[in-house]
């Protein structure tokens, strides 16, 4: 078949390998590269191991509930409560609740012990929490679970509505179980979920602090969150740097299983959280991100989720030292920017068996995040690149299928981020790039299957290209065009890998 070629290294259409420097006269120059034969077998690796997911079930989550002792609830002032400090501090946040409650603000507090929502409602005046229809409850105050307390919103609850007008929200400083139910931010004025209308408008939210456990199972969370700190939607967060030394809490954790998250500012956010499991969920039409693990979170399992319709940015993003995690078997599609992103020094992660398609930017994007394995993913029909890698070293792209992306299948480059809005002290980086690309298929990508600028090391082996876009078929251009004969000899006749390095002076 004329349009099918399989070789040890096959670069169809256009493969650019360039590095730019500046001479004393200020002229840009492109140093030469050496292209040499290398054995291919040492590049082969075993299929990576993935975590056993069989233990993360509704039954296992329910088994974690301690029903005794019984808890108690009371209404008290919000002031001088550590778990509320974030929400009554600077930038007139206290004023938000004063205006909504028309008094010095108070909240519902669950003290040590177990309560379900029905028990909680029975213990409180209806002005704070009431049943408006069988199984439907409206909360008009914040609800705070204190250390040692457990709140269970269970299947006897058809829906818990957190009043937008009343300024209700959920703070977990103990244990929270949301199972087989629905929890919505609620507009009493519109008698509907508090659908997103404009940036900065208060909407109820959930935050679980350091030392807590959160379990959301077979449930729907709708219209949570806005722009204020730790009020993003569904958040699992260690206490802030100013509070953490005082609180001395271990990192928070939780499971989110087989649930739906719709119209939230962030579908999920975490900060310095460990061992969170996000499994089998749907993140639909969220505003900024679908799934957004952040700052120094570790050992996360993000598996079998659908993240789609995100309106401002990405479906799934791991940002700022989110390490040692598994992003596996997800689908990220129809998002405003990229499907899956690793960002700001997120390293030692496995991104495998995912599908990213019809995103308005890249299928997958790696920014300043080295030493990650991208294994056997599919990126199809994205508006820019299948996989983009920037300022990242030790990135391994193995057995990926990259098809019909508007620009390139794989795009690697460096970029000087000085002058951007990046805080270079908080997020340092090196403008270096090294890639190993082994196996997989690149099919009908728009401008080229692979384009790489300024690598410090590039290894390619055993790639398959189908249906090259250009009428003249296979052609090497740029620096590789100068050595195309030697390159094809290495790849076609010797069936070896190609090692591409900058020429040393």
Q: Which residues does each predicted region cover?
A:
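Exposed, low-structure sequence patches enriched in small/polar residues
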Residues: 391, 452-455
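Beta-strand/loop edge motif enriched in small/polar residues
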Residues: 24-323, 332, 340-341, 347, ...
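Pro/Ala/Gly-rich low-complexity, hydrophilic intrinsically disordered segments
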Residues: 212, 476-479
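Bacterial N-terminal signal peptides that target proteins for export
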Residues: 1-9
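Conserved, well-structured beta-alpha core segment at the onset of a catalytic domain
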Residues: 3, 24-27, 449, 459
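C-terminal/domain-terminus segments
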Residues: 455-471
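Bacterial N-terminal signal peptides
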Residues: 8-18
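Eukaryotic tandem repeat interaction scaffolds
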Residues: 323-433
